[in-house]
Amino acid sequence: MWLLLALLSIFQGTPALSLEASEEMEQEPCLAPILEQQEQVLTVALGQPVRLCCGRTERGRHWYKEGSRLASAGRVRGWRGRLEIASFLPEDAGRYLCLARGSMTVVHNLTLLMDDSLTSISNDEDPKTLSSSSSGHVYPQQAPYWTHPQRMEKKLHAVPAGNTVKFRCPAAGNPMPTIHWLKDGQAFHGENRIGGIRLRHQHWSLVMESVVPSDRGTYTCLVENSLGSIRYSYLLDVLERSPHRPILQAGLPANTTAVVGSDVELLCKVYSDAQPHIQWLKHVVINGSSFGADGFPYVQVLKTTDINSSEVEVLYLRNVSAEDAGEYTCLAGNSIGLSYQSAWLTVLPEEDLTWTTATPEARYTDIILYVSGSLVLLVLLLLAGVYHRQVIRGHYSRQPVTIQKLSRFPLARQFSLESRSSGKSSLSLVRGVRLSSSGPPLLTGLVNLDLPLDPLWEFPRDRLVLGKPLGEGCFGQVVRAEAFGMDPSRPDQTSTVAVKMLKDNASDKDLADLVSEMEVMKLIGRHKNIINLLGVCTQEGPLYVIVECAAKGNLREFLRARRPPGPDLSPDGPRSSEGPLSFPALVSCAYQVARGMQYLESRKCIHRDLAARNVLVTEDDVMKIADFGLARGVHHIDYYKKTSNGRLPVKWMAPEALFDRVYTHQSDVWSFEILLWEIFTLGGSPYPGIPVEELFSLLREGHRMERPPNCPSELYGLMRECWHAAPSQRPTFKQLVEALDKVLLAVSEEYLDLRLTFGPFSPSNGDASSTCSSSDSVFSHDPLPLEPSPFPFSDSQTT
């Protein structure tokens, strides 16, 4: 009843219901439960006390604000199921959730708004009546003016795609002015923008999250009252990813002369939009030659990008000697191509750098000494080469220097790693090129393999017995194999593994992609819920990448094979003898995938193709994410092309990835919830019967798939949170793991058995070639949010 009166007072324009209860009242005002946990909005005046209770039950209820549980003491507190605010302030506005302890079920979803009737003018109010305060002070009427013009000095905002932009126009006046926003001279309300906008009138601001190139333009704030108006314009430029290989600053690294025993720094300034892979190389002489038989130079890799490297653009040489003299190259590559520049280091005896300008005779003497020193340097270099040659032939006990030719494969792509590559890998991801100023940066047609030995990962080829094929991937095939002695703890036993290899007709790009995937897997490390790298075979034969074997195939087929009997839920292949899956088992599948994605997120790896088909299942029903290291050409996606199994990859893509090709961890969160929908439909196909052309417009309008019949509303609320149009409003994988962990703790095997509850609904037969319209039942036609999530996620997430 209290809620009904409050809502009626809001809609009728009367003062909002006072939420303060008298101390003599036996019952404090309580919110009655609302069916389907619909959001409730209450308007509270500034300074007004608030006292609400969560139903009639005092115990077992907790209040949360913006994802954080309220303390039991303080000005704003949650106490014995009550929400109490001593005096309502602007910062108290926001979303409050009352959750049942244990099950974390949402009892109430409440939004408190501040009544700004004293700071804005209604149509039926006389501005003159607002010129005096309640204390009797009279303020002169004044046209609008800027209160903080110094905060508006930055007129041009140039930001990368995916960032958040905030424009502010703080103003004042009497009567209190209103603010409106224009884009390129037209009224701007954000209704056609993916993710919408946030207009914070109390802060005189416009906020746009996850900006894309279509957001470019001139944004004007128009502030006006009855006495006048003022305006100010901002120019927004959204910077797209630059499709260019790294650019090296001219003149760097620079030729350097140093004395023996001094320290030298060589600087290489790299500009690259995509994450560059940088290496410092020293040119060496082998058997009296600087180049191999194939024309590629011999180089020693001195420094490479790794996770702990913060100054990879600087090469430090300590206590240099004559042997350090020579040519050094800074090599930088990204997904587009390679760039490099070289410099010479000259090392002289200390006395040879004692220059003087006292007399012409002294200058001539210095020149003679310099020439003599150069001759001595050449002799030393020759002696050093002979000595090094003797060391190689004599097999001295000192550790040999790692010398290698430039690896003959291209830098296939930018790793999906924001952090840089690990020092554990000695492999240099560069295509074999001749380091000259005239040749092109990339060569074509190279298919020979010349990979350096990586002792940490190399596995003897003769201990690997290949078996039957398991399938074909994007650029190769996967076969089952038996590896003898793969497990160090069981050196006399064999292990079943999967081996990735190239097809017979593979190109040099296919080779580069496989090498790139191998390197990414080295960098990522090990986790229970991802497919882990076990070893590689790079020497004396084709490249083999050895990974864990998942005996039960991919998750989609795993789910479909375990559908309960029925005419509408039939598997494509043979039915599993294990029987249908229970509800806790399905939640466990989602939980394990979320854990794997949380780990990949911690390693700065963006998957970009998360789906049930890319999750593999082991013999022990452990979920393992696969294909996180694949090179994917996101700028050349055919949106209308089906995969080999008939599914459209775009149906798993977030709107910002689909329309603007912006890939972040939050776009992976969107894909994860499509995967969650697949789980609770037991391998169903997303958006069944919806043509791709129509899907685009439906997603822009905010439509989302309906709740699967066998999915609880709590989990569907979780899906809707992850399908938020604004990426920053989606939960992180860490929050998803915590939420699913709570669900697992709350349910038991008796909670829900799919054998008894699966109804006739089957989304598995839909196909993108269908001519069905958007009226199909798979869509919910209410824009977000349809219903709240039961989990207290924060409203703003960082991507």
Curated annotation (Swiss-Prot):
Reaction(s) this enzyme catalyzes, per UniProt: L-tyrosyl-[protein] + ATP = O-phospho-L-tyrosyl-[protein] + ADP + H(+)
Positions bearing carbohydrate: N109, N255, N287, N308, N319
Disruption phenotype: No visible phenotype. Mice display an elevated bile acid pool and elevated excretion of bile acids, due to loss of normal regulation of CYP7A1, the rate-limiting enzyme in bile acid synthesis. When on a normal diet, mice are prone to develop increased levels of white adipose tissue, hyperlipidemia, hypercholesterolemia, glucose intolerance and insulin resistance. Mice lacking both FGFR3 and FGFR4 display pronounced dwarfism, and while their lungs appear normal at birth, they are completely blocked in alveogenesis and do not form secondary septae to delimit alveoli.
All copies of domain Protein kinase, residue ranges: 464-752
Modified how: N-glycosylated. Isoform 1 and isoform 2 are glycosylated. Full maturation of the glycan chains in the Golgi is essential for high affinity interaction with FGF19. Ubiquitinated. Subject to proteasomal degradation when not fully glycosylated.
Example of a GO MF term: fibroblast growth factor receptor activity
Keywords on record: ATP-binding, Cell membrane, Disulfide bond, Endoplasmic reticulum, Endosome, Glycoprotein, Immunoglobulin domain, Kinase, Membrane, Nucleotide-binding, Phosphoprotein, Receptor, Repeat, Signal, Transferase, Transmembrane, Transmembrane helix, Tyrosine-protein kinase, Ubl conjugation
Pfam family, one: PK_Tyr_Ser-Thr
Induction comment: Isoform 1 and isoform 2 are up-regulated by estradiol during myogenic differentiation and down-regulated in fully developed myotubes.
Transmembrane regions: 367-387
Topology feature Extracellular, residues: 17-366
Activity regulation: Present in an inactive conformation in the absence of bound ligand. Ligand binding leads to dimerization and activation by autophosphorylation on tyrosine residues.
Signal peptide boundaries: 1-16
Record-listed E.C. numbers: 2.7.10.1
GO cellular component: endoplasmic reticulum; endosome; plasma membrane
Topological domain ranges for the Cytoplasmic compartment: 388-799
Protein name, as recorded: Fibroblast growth factor receptor 4
Species of the source: Mus musculus
